[in-house]
Amino acid sequence: MLKLFLSEVSQSINTCVINILIFSFFNKVYGKKYQSRILYGVAYIGAVTAMILVNQIQIAPVNLLYTIVYMDVLSVWLFRADFKKFWLYNLIFLLILFFSDAITFSFWSAIRGDSYGEIILQEELTAISNLLNILVMFLGYRIVLAFLCKNDMNCLLYTSDAA
């Protein structure tokens, strides 16, 4: 019971961090459309809540579809995303999420020799995997943002207020 609770809490923390990174990434790459912190705060809370609910379904294609639609809608509604470019940047961020998950589970698979399904069924490994996933996501986020913003002076601010 405690292991399941820790697994759920770590998944929720992971979801919060994913959304912090998405909002931060979009702010750096696109720029905010509005000045209201309340609007972005409410949008963040709504996004985290919705993502946690979708994650509870535990159907990978549904999670992926939700994440794609959510990122596209968010980038257009709350950020100054150029319609021609936002598909590419959103795909890049989606790849960060995908590869961080793949790297995390590959790590456990290499160390323990377990398959993805076996790792998922072990709540303590899932909890630790979620925390490791956060680290890998953050590193991927920083690397990609540094690459995308190397010639853009507005993006250089990310070093002082990263996530």
Regions found by a protein language model. Give the residues of each.
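Short, strongly hydrophobic alpha-helical membrane anchors
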Residues: M1-S7
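Juxtamembrane segments at transmembrane-helix boundaries
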Residues: S12-I13, V17-I38, I52-L157
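Alpha-helical transmembrane segments
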Residues: Y40-V48
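Conserved small/polar residues in nucleotide/adenosyl-binding loops
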Residues: Y158-A163
